[in-house]
């Protein structure tokens, strides 16, 4: 039977706990110690009926209690007599309860709380709380988490009410907010420029923006992630100036799909280089369309046709050769064909039908963030949907804030920013990380609570092992439906080995699991490989190469598996063995034995007992059994009991008689054949 606490009932009835306790003890004879005591639902219902008939009780008046009791005299006579005897005894307790109620404290927690945090909320020494837990049968250290029910027992012993923190607007609900088709409008494409070092990525952005930022950057390497919006023929394009593909993939690893189109810059005199190849693989893994810009075509030794030939080797066939990859020959230095390249970007974006709803709450991604001495945490946000205004409350990853000021890419103060517009904002509580998602919420309090919840979740997630794919747990992850594809990154000492391993691995694909080599390259296993593996939930296989120290540290941090081999066959066999373990075993039926029913006996509360003679093999108790009549299987079940004379036995061999019952089947007749069998699992040895 369910119960309700006194203070909860008092709150429902809009009376003080003190008055309710008096009513319970004096008029109903229900003995309660204080406002934390629990009473039966039946008694609570009776009190509700009493107060419903006499609303003056709700005002806190107890003077007319005698006349009310008269109305319920028959029901309550026994309780009244008991209550009179207990009044004197409970007077002192009532006084204590009054004082206790005045000091009653209510604290709120989430699903779990550490012992230390609970002690701080109760304003009690940690040792006292640990002692209370031990008396409750819970052994917990100071930094150990306890659940809500355990914390509630501790609080009850201190006379404190514990309430579960009210969940305010889950971020997931904000993320999946759907837009009406009629509210969607065309938005500018977001473009990332990628390519090998010194192939002219920043120079190309210079030519596009008509501003010389290259000269201010050391060594020709971009020093930061910037975001700029340009206007061409009345249409806008937003460019993210990333240091190659590392930031692109790092953001994707954090769940942020920012880029709509990638401009792949390839120098006409150099052709496809290792970082170009990496950029291509990263784009393919992310499923982002590419527009190839063959740069430096005005340079001596430029050979655009060789570049196009090399592109085909990586699955990118240009349009003029019958493929679907848009390719433009440009020169950032002499500003040649830049307009044409941008038109191709807009054409690609048009095919993608990029739309957003600027009327909804804003959401997007952090492009970069830093701590400024004078301005505090500063973040560059890319609005991907909705409109962001100064004064909006936002949650960004596990931090939050209210936007105090907003600047565009030229440093000009603005009041709002729509879809695909990058802005720099002030007002966050902490510095977020690049790739963090941001969402606008109704107020700062909501943002703070959601950020705290996110921090708690991150803390609990960090205590649990990551769910990255490894060869050892591949089978269990497949069964749980977590993995449908095994992504592999291959690094080897020579290109021939890379190609050999790639071809061998991809041949292992089955209907259940596809093996996909995301990236193959020559050289040591680096941080870049681990970053790509993190983003793609892949494993890294090295042949005659080793990971560097930074790669090992990052792999440990991200729970990415690195396997190194000296023999190609071993690498193939390891992946094959993991996949064979994933395959469902084949089952073969093994006949144990059969028996003929010679007599049947019906016994009440037991059913039909069959007296049988074992013809061949043996019968086993609990074995799968089929009942065959005139050569036709009429029922399949199992042997629920098996006896020889009066003794229970596990099995009966050929030539012996026995008595048995078939589970859930009583229609056994003389002449029936009972066949015992088992299904034997046979491990798959081939894919």
Curated annotation (Swiss-Prot):
Region (G2): 220-224
UniProt KW keywords: Cytoplasm, GTP-binding, Initiation factor, Nucleotide-binding, Protein biosynthesis
Residue span of region G3: 241-244
Keyword GTP-binding recorded: yes
SUPFAM superfamilies: Initiation factor IF2/eIF5b, domain 3, P-loop containing nucleoside triphosphate hydrolases, Translation proteins
Region G4, residue ranges: 295-298
Chain positions recorded as GTP binding sites: 195-202, 241-245, 295-298
Region (G5): 331-333
NCBIfam families: IF-2 (TIGR00487), small_GTP (TIGR00231)
Protein name, entry field: Translation initiation factor IF-2
Lineage: Bacteria, Bacillati, Bacillota, Clostridia, Eubacteriales
Gene of this entry: infB
